[in-house]
């Protein structure tokens, strides 16, 4: 609310200064012939403008209010019913005092508030559009300056040739250590196995008797002492024959 009161006070001072300047500018005219309507109208506009204080929150540039308040519309209707020019003077005074108002919204206030009165304000489009338009940027980002940091695409030459690879592998010696295939000499001489089986015992008793009688002298006779030159195979054969004879004799003894 402080900006609104400041605005109203400055408007009052401005209107009073305008009235004083008008009175001071025409000293030669008689007092009875002086045109008093303009000073009275400006003074009256300054007094009527107070009713539009609630419209500042809607008319200020950057305001987020979707619509004016009911009190604002009542004040606009009061100003327009008194004099449509008062709305125009209010816009001019606010622009001179540094207040940034949206002239498009201000001129559309009669339609927004459903007041069928057109103020017909002569508002220049540049002054009305300067608060809304974005600030003009200085031509700092010119194409030449944008391209000033020239990027040198030339990079240091990279040698794509790979280093020579040595394919020579260390010589592999395929010569294996000599394997001795000579196996230790195995003695293939096996002891003589007597194939004589005790089948002799199954022969007829006549043959058994004859064999026993034939072999008895041998059994009775002392066996010669084995000489050191007799091989082990001979000793084994003799032992087997001796066992066979003993078995046959025992078998014959049982039969007898």
Swiss-Prot record:
GO terms for molecular function: lipid binding. Glycans are attached at residue 41. Disulfide bonds join 45-88, 55-72, 73-113, 86-121. A lipid is attached at residue 225 (GPI-anchor amidated serine). Probable lipid transfer protein. InterPro entries: Bifun_inhib/LTP/seed_sf, Bifunc_inhib/LTP/seed_store, LTSS, Plant_nsLTP. The gene is LTPG23. The lineage of its organism: Eukaryota, Viridiplantae, Streptophyta, Embryophyta, Tracheophyta. Belongs to the plant LTP family. Residues 1-21 form the signal peptide. One of its GO terms (biological process) is lipid transport. Residues 138-230 have a biased composition (Low complexity). Keywords: Cell membrane, Disulfide bond, Glycoprotein, GPI-anchor, Lipoprotein, Membrane, Signal, Transmembrane, Transmembrane helix. Residues 125-230 are annotated as: Disordered. It is found in: Cell membrane. This is Non-specific lipid transfer protein GPI-anchored 23. One of its GO terms (cellular component) is side of membrane.
């Amino acid at each position: 609310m402080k900006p609104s009161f400041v605005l109203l006070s400055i408007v009052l001072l401005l209107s009073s200064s305008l009235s004083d300047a008008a009175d001071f500018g025409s000293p030669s005219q008689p007092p009875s012939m002086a045109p008093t309507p303009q000073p009275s109208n400006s003074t009256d506009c300054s007094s009527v403008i107070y009713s539009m204080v609630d419209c500042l929150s809607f008319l200020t540039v950057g305001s987020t209010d979707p619509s004016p308040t009911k009190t604002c519309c009542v004040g606009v209707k009061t100003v327009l019913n008194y004099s449509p020019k008062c709305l125009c003077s209010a816009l001019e005074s606010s622009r001179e005092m540094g207040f940034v108002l949206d002239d498009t919204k201000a001129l559309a206030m009669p339609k927004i508030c459903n007041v069928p009165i057109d103020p017909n304000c002569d508002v220049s489009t540049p002054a009305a559009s300067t608060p809304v338009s974005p600030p003009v940027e200085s031509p700092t980002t010119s194409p030449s300056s944008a391209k000033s940091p020239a990027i040198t695409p030339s990079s240091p030459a990279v040698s794509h040739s790979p280093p020579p690879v040595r394919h020579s592998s260390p010589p592999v010696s395929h010569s294996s250590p000599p394997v001795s295939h000579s196996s230790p000499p195995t003695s293939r001489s096996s002891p003589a196995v007597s194939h004589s089986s005790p089948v002799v015992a199954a022969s007829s008793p006549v043959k058994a008797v004859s064999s026993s009688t034939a072999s008895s002298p041998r059994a009775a006779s002392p066996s010669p002492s084995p000489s050191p030159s007799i091989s082990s195979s001979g000793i084994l054969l003799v032992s087997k024959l001796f066992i066979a004879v003993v078995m046959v004799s025992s078998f014959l003894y049982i039969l007898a």
